[in-house]
Amino acid sequence: MAEGLVLKGTMRAHTDVVTAIATPIDNSDMIVTASRDRSIILWHLTKEDKTYGVPRRRLTGHSHFVQDVVLSSDGQFALSGSWDGELRLWDLAAGTSARRFVGHTKDVLSVAFSIDNRQIVSASRDRTIKLWNTLGECKYTIQDGDAHSDWVSCVRFSPSTLQPTIVSASWDRTVKVWNLTNCKLRNTLAGHNGYVNTVAVSPDGSLCASGGKDGVILLWDLAEGKRLYSLDAGSIIHALCFSPSRYWLCAATEQSIKIWDLESKSIVEDLKVDLKTEADATSGGGNANKKKVIYCTSLNWSADGSTLFSGYTDGVARVWAIGRY
């Protein structure tokens, strides 16, 4: 009996690319997704055979693609970043936008909450990283000097409380590590041969993984600022995430979702979507467009590491679960 991931169901409500997925830390039956359809959807997870979740609320207000969404640790608020240049804080119970964060001069590509939810960080095509409080006040802007020289595509807080850290990825081909206390540069991690789309920090804060255009994932020791090793994903990488329960790294590439066991550095899963099988399952056959090419653009694990949520270019969220087969 092998352990692997099987497609559990789909979640359909977005009409364009699913750009981000946020999962609650208490493993409750909800997730939040963001999309190029300019909306954020709060889902209730029914975990039924075909339809894994149903839309509970659609949050609207952004005037352009919503590129990223994250949840506060109590699950009460969602934070989004959009190509309209703004961040928004959403009250999920009310379904309303509680705050707008205005200051970036170009598209916001990435947002994150600090561990205590008191600080917010954002990354933009204006090449800056901004640090905000929850009132929507910009407290610091990382720009010029040591800052990135091209679009900042992704920004994440390290979960390590000993050394509060921000990690950013950029189209300038670098990953940068910043001290949160003074917003000063600690390390520039160079090694990619193309733009970097995404960066992920391991659950214990010791490692970070980066990926993008060159199709190679680089693993870094965050404390030392040193490159540890690389994993060849074979095509453009759009998202990365570490499993919260296994020593696994998951990558959304333009070919498939690949999962590595970091101990053996071998691929344990290579998840592809069969659109014909899916069409037969959801509509009982019919005119599925088999020529359509879709790929995964966003990924996140459930807090217990049992379920992998993946968002695709066709607007569908697909749910994979660990099972035996």
From Swiss-Prot:
WD repeats lie at residues 13-44, 61-91, 103-133, 147-179, 191-221, 232-261, 291-321. One of its GO terms (biological process) is rescue of stalled ribosome. Gene3D superfamilies: YVTN repeat-like/Quinoprotein amine dehydrogenase. Keywords: Repeat, Ribonucleoprotein, Ribosomal protein, WD repeat. It comes from Glycine max (Soybean). InterPro entries: G-protein_beta_WD-40_rep (IPR020472), RACK1-like (IPR045223), WD40/YVTN_repeat-like_dom_sf (IPR015943), WD40_repeat_CS (IPR019775), WD40_repeat_dom_sf (IPR036322), WD40_rpt (IPR001680). Pfam families: WD40 (PF00400). GO terms for molecular function: protein kinase C binding; ribosome binding; translation regulator activity. GO terms for cellular component: cytosol; nucleus; ribonucleoprotein complex; ribosome. Belongs to the WD repeat G protein beta family. Ribosomal protein RACK1 subfamily. PANTHER family: RECEPTOR FOR ACTIVATED PROTEIN KINASE C RACK1. It comes from the Eukaryota. Transmembrane segments: none annotated. Signal peptide: none annotated. This is Small ribosomal subunit protein RACK1. SMART domains: WD40 (SM00320).
